[in-house]
Design a protein with these regions (language model features):
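Active-site neighborhoods of enzymes that stabilize oxyanions during catalysis
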Residues: 29-38, 44, 80, 145-210, ...
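Bacterial N-terminal signal peptides that target proteins for export
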Residues: 1-7
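Thiolate-centered catalytic microenvironments shared by cysteine-dependent enzyme domains
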Residues: 25, 90-181, 256, 260-276, ...
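C-terminal soluble interaction/assembly domains
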Residues: 238, 243-296
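Helix-loop module immediately N-terminal to the HCX5R catalytic loop
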Residues: 81-109, 220-251
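Mature N-terminal segment immediately following signal peptide/propeptide cleavage
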Residues: 30-59, 70-73
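Bacterial N-terminal signal peptides
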Residues: 7-17
Length: 296
């Protein structure tokens, strides 16, 4: 309860600092409400013939212990370069296609994604589907598995038997920001109509960040840690406006290795903003000894 109260005060303070022009730009509706479904919606559609629920997790153990009935497991190493963070960049399109088809994803599938233990896992898979041109069929489960369990909805340990899918993909490289391009726009993001946002906790941002980036910790898009529901579209848009977003800008997010930034990317797309994620993120940037800023 105390965390809810603190979060509420922070939100009021944040909204109070938004100018009238920013508030007007914020709007009140998501441009893509279909990208997010509630636990109630999912509970009512569990029997839909074309429904594919994906349990995105880092290991088989958490899936085997409990998952939403009918969910198929897709480990993070099936859609990133490494089995666990920090080795996380996009796999080649043909491998991504094969891994999705193996769990029964087809062109007509309605894909619902939830994370087993960390919401950015689900957002990262959404980003991957967007890269493949399939995000129009996909949505995140608001609140994820935590909310499903909190509401005492049914769980299962059964592994569904599914036929391989047939999925058409088309890579969209424009959603993946590359280091050379980020370096170019970081000199003056506003002139490039870019909002460059660091999705890491503030202490990580202050410890070193890309020049021109603003701090936008991804968890602030949720109500509270123990209530991992997405804030309202109006609140989310106000947050982006406060960070410097203006209509027509491209939101470019990064973090340490591309997990947390995926959630910022998802929120931007949910609101209808042009968005990209710097997949290499701070790990690539710092390893390449690119310019860095410390502090605020």
């Amino acid at each position: 309860m105390r965390l809810h109260w603190i979060a509420g005060l922070l939100m009021v303070a944040m909204l109070a600092s938004v100018s009238p022009a920013q508030a007007k730009a914020a709007g009140s509706k998501a441009a893509h409400p279909e990208f997010l479904v509630s636990t109630q919606w999912l509970a009512q559609h569990l029997s839909d013939a074309n429904l594919v629920i994906i349990h995105a997790g880092s290991s088989d153990d958490d899936y085997n212990s409990a998952h939403i009935p009918g969910a198929r497991h897709l480990a993070t190493n099936k859609f990133t370069e490494g089995p666990t963070p920090p080795n996380t960049e996009l796999l080649p399109s043909d491998k991504l296609q094969a891994n999705l088809e193996a769990i029964g994803v087809s062109d007509d599938s309605r894909i619902i994604i939830y994370a087993s233990d960390w919401d950015p896992f689900a957002a990262r898979l959404f980003f991957t589907l967007d890269y493949l041109g399939r995000a129009g069929n996909a949505a995140l489960l608001d609140g994820g598995l935590d909310m499903w369990i909190h509401e005492k909805r049914p769980l299962s340990t059964d592994v569904p038997t599914v036929a391989p899918g047939k999925l058409t993909v088309q890579a969209h490289p424009e959603v993946v920001a590359r280091m050379d391009w980020v370096k170019q726009v970081s000199a003056d993001p506003a002139a490039a109509h870019v909002l460059l946002t660091d999705a890491r906790p503030l202490r990580r941002y202050r410890g070193g960040h890309i020049p021109g980036a603003v701090p936008g910790f991804w968890e602030k898009t949720q109500l509270a840690e123990e209530t991992p529901l997405l804030r309202s579209p109006q609140e989310l848009a106000a947050m982006f406006a406060r960070l410097g977003y203006k209509p027509g800008y491209k939101v470019v997010s990064y973090c340490e290795v591309g997990w947390q930034a995926s959630f910022t990317y998802f929120v931007a797309r949910y609101l209808g903003y042009d968005a990209a994620m710097y997949d290499g993120s701070w790990t690539e940037w710092s390893t390449a000894k690119q310019p860095a800023v410390r502090g605020d």
